[in-house]
Amino acid sequence: MKQAKIIGLSTVIALSGIILVACGSKTSEQKNIQFSIPTDVASLDTTILTDQYSYDVAGNVEEGLTRVDSKGNAALALAKSIDVSKDGLTYTVTLKDNLKWSNGDKLTAKDFVYSWKRAVDPKTGSEYAYLMGAVSGANDIISGKSSLDTLGIKAESDTEFTVTLAQPTPYFKFLLSEPVYYPLDQKVVDKYGKQYGTSSDKTVYNGPFMFKSDKAWTGTNKNFSIYANPNYYDKSAVKSKQIDFQVISNANTGAQLYKQGKLDFTLLSTTDLINANKKTEGYTVFKQARTDYIEYNQSGKNASSPDAQKALANQDIRQALNLATNRAEVVKTALPGSTAATSFTPVGMSKTSTGEDFATYAKQDYSYDPTKAKELWAKGLKELGLTKLSLSLEAAGDLAPSEATANFLQTAYQQNLPGLTVNLKLVPFKQRLNDAQNGNFDMVLSGWGGDYAEPSTFLQLFTTGQSYNDGKFSSKTYDDAFKAATTTPDVLEPAKVDEHYKAAEAALYEGSYINPIDFQANPALMNPKITGLEFHSTGLAYDLKSAYIK
């Protein structure tokens, strides 16, 4: 946490750290940064991408009206100015002059109008459309109640447009840095249709970097490169001519390549690997605003069996599973560097109106109590007329921390809850995303990283009907608390906003609707010669715009 930034009437912590601030100048023979990610890029379509690893790439080749800087500010990017009305409902945006796409097309206000309407169009199916909910008309369009023309955005000229909000949103400038708010070149999207963003040659770029035909991303390959974008308005600030990405799912391989000088950045994802490399030059730990948690299928369909379906709808069963979770031991065994979760919103992301860490303020009693867990388990089974139960637990098998966590939980649950059989379902990360989104699971180990530094980036996930509410539960208490925090009149009173968000956390806990496991940290090895790389614990994790090897 670098700086607490007060925006309007809400307190937001923009968590950002600039790593090894630049000193000196680049050499004429610059070495390309070799950067690894642990799983495949799913998409470059900024309207529909959902995972952090796709964002780590897309966020460096695309850009929005704002970009979070090294001090945690929502700094102007494509926008030359953003003027806000006194009531906080109207934003007048003026774009920088002579903006261009990487293909030479002019980037204009119409590209934002098109993109935002595409995002909220139900036909697009964007899971991030809910982030557009701050804009007037968006929610009714998403739900199919209104036409696209009612969205609160209007192009006044090629370089100016106005935005009307549904409610004052103190963190709206941070939302403008999110991929779903990025512009799109309609000509290119129309050309490729549903194939847009499925490979780098079917995408166009406006950010610091771009793809070329050389070392392109085909949609499936493990090695690809991005290059400095000559049409980028701030190209003098881009310090690397080329950055090479490698998809390396085996963390041991990544560590070996780092020590051989073939990688400059790699994540360490197993306990043994972390302990073995704590004294390795370049070892560091990135604290993320991210929570790993278990979702329970409460939709009434698509569970592994009728018994599983009715069991997960039973609060005693869910509470027993929560109480049988030894979070401290999970962290010690499978997730070194992380900390046991005490709420859904993670520690270190935002502060209350009094300056207290929000997660500390909203802490719930997510404790380990195997005795009480057994009692509730027996009670739940009796209510259901069962003596034994089989549940599946799905996790990303190509991500070592997820696999290790799932293995630990399988053993712990079967030991603590008599009659329970846990069937592990370890699948590729992409499939885990799809299964969760389609409700094809009993229990799934999920993770959420904050898109901006305010509790709503976490708590809006579980409102009734929200696209990321994969368990499909509904709580009026939760919905009412979240609505009160984010709408007038209380949205304008920070202390009341804090109270309502805390009430939402309490509703999650009391209903045992989810099971928070840990607040995530990412141990990594990074070449000490890398300078100018900015790490953000929310939004774009690794901003490579000014990064290079000195």
UniProtKB/Swiss-Prot annotation:
GO cellular component, one term: periplasmic space
Keywords carried by this UniProt record: Cell membrane, Lipoprotein, Membrane, Palmitate, Peptide transport, Protein transport, Signal, Transport
Description of the deletion phenotype: Inactivation of the gene impairs growth on low concentrations of di-valine.
Lipid-binding residues (covalent, S-diacylglycerol cysteine): 23
A Gene Ontology biological process term: peptide transport
Family assignment from sequence similarity: Belongs to the bacterial solute-binding protein 5 family.
Listed name of the protein: Dipeptide-binding protein
Gene this chain is encoded by: dppA
